[in-house]
A protein has these predicted regions:
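Bilobed periplasmic-binding protein/Venus flytrap-like ligand-binding cleft at the lobe interface
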Residues: 147, 151, 250, 256-284
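An extracytoplasmic/periplasmic, membrane-proximal ligand-sensing/linker region
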Residues: 38-40, 179, 242-245, 267-328
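N-terminal secretory signal peptides that target proteins for export/translocation
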Residues: 1-9
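Generic short N-terminal amphipathic or hydrophobic helices
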Residues: 1, 15-16, 268, 279
Length: 328
């Protein structure tokens, strides 16, 4: 029939076919979105297992699995700060089956092999997690003022552990040195899990560490929280002052975790994932689990998360430039 139409009246037949395709295309797109997901989804965590990002990632993966009816599996791809895992997701197929739990600071490495503004589609914020200045309990300083006084006295003999450059923790430690005029020695670790273990063991005496991998040790007394980097105190540690309260109001250190997908991921899939993520983050169960881990749930729209990425990455780029730090 189509061949006959084309032979008889090619212009009209072509128009009919084109109109038919245009009219049915939305239905195809809707069907694709409705069928998603039809197989396992990989949630890439660009940090080692056992660390703070991994802890939050596993909470979200479990709940997304339940909501979507397909397994969401955490895949740890650490290396280069967060460069390796982040770059892998940037180059993945934009089909909704490879996601990334992105953390503030992903745009800070030099020449990472991806563009934070062009290579990702923001899905939504997940949580805010403060960086905490914490110590081995044998350190004689119990407040931030005492830590600063001790740092001025001990100088390079006082060691402070952080994850590697280019992470927020590392740059915050450098900012702390500059603001306080101290010369403490920064020791970098592959992740927050190994850092926490060495801090408990007394191999390093002070740390700029995220809360999730250390909160149990803080609550048991194996570690001491000196000050939290969030604007206000955290519910999990209500007696621990903020860094601002402790005398350094310009030193705010908060990591924002969020879900992103490769750029060009179909908008219906992004919207589906955002809708499920927001439901998850408003559930009392997840809010409590994140709070117990030292974070706060932060449901958002994709646009709100995109603005957060731009603001936070810009803020830390300015810190790096001001301090004259070299980023590898």
């Amino acid at each position: 029939m189509i061949e006959a139409l084309l032979a008889a009246r090619p212009g009209r037949a072509a128009l009919i076919i084109v109109l038919s395709v245009l009219l049915t295309a939305p239905a195809w797109r809707d069907a694709t979105a409705e069928e998603y997901p039809s197989r396992t989804i990989s949630l890439v965590v660009a940090y080692p297992a056992g660390g703070g990002v991994d802890t939050v990632g596993r909470v979200i993966a479990q709940k997304l699995s339940e909501a979507l009816g397909q397994q969401v599996v955490v895949v740890n791809r650490p290396g280069g700060g967060s460069v390796i895992g982040t770059r892998d997701v940037a180059k993945a197929q934009p089909d909704g089956y490879t996601l990334l739990l992105m953390v503030t600071g992903a745009a800070l490495p030099a020449n990472p092999g991806y563009d934070i503004d062009k290579d990702f589609s923001a899905i939504g914020l997940v949580a805010s997690v403060p960086v905490v200045i914490m110590s081995n309990p044998s350190l004689p300083a119990k407040s931030l003022a005492e830590v600063i006084a001790l740092a001025k006295k001990e100088g390079a003999k006082l060691t402070v552990g952080t994850p590697p450059s280019p992470t927020l923790n590392y740059f915050a430690a450098e900012q702390f040195k500059a603001m306080t005029g101290t010369d403490i020695t920064i020791v970098t670790y592959k992740g927050t899990g190994p850092l926490t273990n060495d801090l408990v063991g007394g191999h390093v005496m002070l740390a700029f560490n995220t809360l999730p991998p250390a909160i149990g040790n803080i609550q048991s007394g194996a570690l001491r929280a000196i000050a939290v980097g969030s604007p206000s105190r955290v519910a999990a540690l209500p007696d621990v002052p903020t860094i601002a309260e402790s005398g350094l109001p310009e030193l705010e250190i908060v990591q924002y975790y969020g879900l992103v997908a490769p750029a060009a991921t179909p908008q219906p899939i992004v919207e589906r994932l955002n809708a499920e993520l927001r439901k998850i983050l408003t559930s009392e169960d997840v809010k409590k689990r994140l709070m117990d881990a030292g974070g706060d749930a932060m449901p958002s729209t994709p646009a709100e998360y995109a603005r957060n990425i731009q603001h936070e990455e810009g803020k830390w780029h300015a810190v790096i430039k001001k301090l004259g730090l070299v980023v590898n």
